[in-house]
Amino acid sequence: MGKVTGISGRFGARYGSTLRKKWKEIMEKRYDEHQCPYCKTTGKVIRLASGIWYCKKCNSKWAGLAYTPY
């Protein structure tokens, strides 16, 4: 059975293991289900751009961190 690499498996053996692990942590946080700080709904928050987050349920838009909304 092969090793499970997750989202960073597309890089193969390139870029070094440390950078791939750091990138994997950041991307898993980015695509995780986030909670809206206004309506407290989970799973409806999307990233529009770097640092700009939007809730599909209450239509609120706010500035957060680059890869996480708060």
Curated annotation (Swiss-Prot):
A zinc finger (C4-type) spans 36-58. Its cofactor is Zn(2+). GO terms for cellular component: ribonucleoprotein complex; ribosome. GO terms for molecular function: large ribosomal subunit rRNA binding; structural constituent of ribosome; zinc ion binding. Keywords: Metal-binding, Ribonucleoprotein, Ribosomal protein, RNA-binding, rRNA-binding, Zinc, Zinc-finger. SUPFAM superfamilies: Zn-binding ribosomal proteins (SSF57829). Transmembrane segments: none annotated. It holds the Pfam family Ribosomal_L37ae. One of its GO terms (biological process) is translation. It comes from the Archaea. Binds 1 zinc ion per subunit. Zn(2+) binds at C36, C39, C55, C58. The keyword Ion transport does not apply. NCBIfam families: PRK03976.1. Binds to the 23S rRNA. Belongs to the eukaryotic ribosomal protein eL43 family. Putative zinc-binding subfamily. Part of the 50S ribosomal subunit. This is Large ribosomal subunit protein eL43. The lineage of its organism: Archaea, Thermoproteota, Thermoprotei, Sulfolobales, Sulfolobaceae.
